[in-house]
């Protein structure tokens, strides 16, 4: 028998959803069966699968040991002795991290250890702000993600309530995200709005731009303003009103101004001439608008954060 004590970050979850996180090797169908058979109890008594857990509840799980074997990559953050994070801002609820271009956000086939999320977990674990043995189901998480070869601001939630609020606010478009990019040529008009539809091509890992609705296409809206043009390159500020995969890269390529260094949508000969192997794109400014109640994060309303430095801006525009 294993027993869990519900702490603040685990509270207010349905019992069945908590089990999916706390015991990931236990299939959902089997969890429901064991709840019915009273092999899973709350405070020593039978509970329904939709029971809302409360802080201080004690769960008794009469399950075989194999369901509690840790996944092989679960504790990989422990191998990071010196976590490397560029922290723009930190408080008791969130961190704003300035991710360098080239660092992957989450593990993929090419990288399992050196990821932004693993450095985050190692940092909080070593500060003793995150204690996995006490949390049961909650793990600090990143709230937005950007491509490996794109740098910029990534939001991290330290606790479950902050994660819930941020996910809701991102979904409701109550945060404003601004990017800097360098594109080829000068966009005309120099300031404008791009509305299109993007459809993913899983075979090529790219998206295709359409100017009319298409099956599986998702609407994309982008605002841009050209800040400076020099040597047939333009520095452009972009605001995303939607957050689609490769939205900026594909939209600018479609209007004839691909990003410098972009290996998927750009011009190879130009990239080689400038010696750029990563797209000149950086998530450099973030504003917490929060026009509606943000609960424990209300103190962030109206606050704006800007990355300390955008490497390609200094290189090409001084």
Describe these PLM feature segments.
Residues 1-33, 83-85, 214-221, 226, ...:
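Pseudouridine synthases involved in rRNA/tRNA modification
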Residues 1-202, 306, 311-317:
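RNA pseudouridine synthases
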């Amino acid at each position: 028998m294993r027993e869990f004590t519900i702490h603040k970050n685990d509270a207010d979850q349905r019992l069945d959803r908590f089990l999916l996180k706390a015991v990931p090797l236990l299939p959902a169908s089997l969890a429901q069966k064991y709840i019915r058979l009273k092999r899973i109890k709350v405070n020593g008594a039978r509970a329904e699968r939709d029971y809302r857990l409360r802080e201080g509840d004690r769960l008794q799980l009469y399950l075989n040991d194999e369901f509690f074997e840790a996944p092989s990559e679960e504790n990989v953050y422990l191998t990071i002795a010196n976590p490397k994070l560029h922290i723009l801002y930190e408080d008791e609820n969130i961190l704003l991290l300035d991710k360098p271009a080239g660092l992957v956000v989450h593990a993929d086939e090419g990288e399992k250890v050196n990821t932004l999320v693993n450095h985050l977990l190692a940092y909080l674990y070593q500060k003793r702000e995150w204690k996995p043995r006490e949390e049961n189901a909650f793990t600090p998480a990143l709230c937005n993600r950007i491509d490996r070869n794109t740098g910029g601001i990534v939001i991290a939630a330290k606790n479950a309530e902050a994660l819930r609020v941020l996910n809701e606010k991102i979904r409701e478009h109550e945060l404003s995200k601004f990017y800097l990019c360098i594109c080829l040529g000068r966009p005309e008009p120099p300031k404008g709005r791009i509305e299109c539809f993007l459809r993913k091509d899983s075979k090529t890992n790219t998206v295709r731009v359409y100017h009319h609705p298409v099956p599986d296409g998702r609407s994309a809206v982008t605002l841009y303003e050209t800040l400076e043009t020099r040597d047939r390159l333009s520095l452009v500020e972009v605001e995303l009103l939607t957050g689609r995969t490769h939205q900026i890269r594909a939209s600018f390529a479609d209007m004839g101004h691909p990003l410098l260094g972009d290996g998927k949508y750009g011009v190879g000969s130009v990239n080689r001439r400038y010696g750029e192997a990563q797209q000149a794109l950086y998530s450099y400014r973030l504003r917490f608008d929060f026009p509606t109640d943000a609960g424990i994060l209300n103190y962030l309303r109206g606050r704006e954060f800007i990355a300390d430095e955008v490497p390609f801006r200094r290189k090409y525009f001084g």
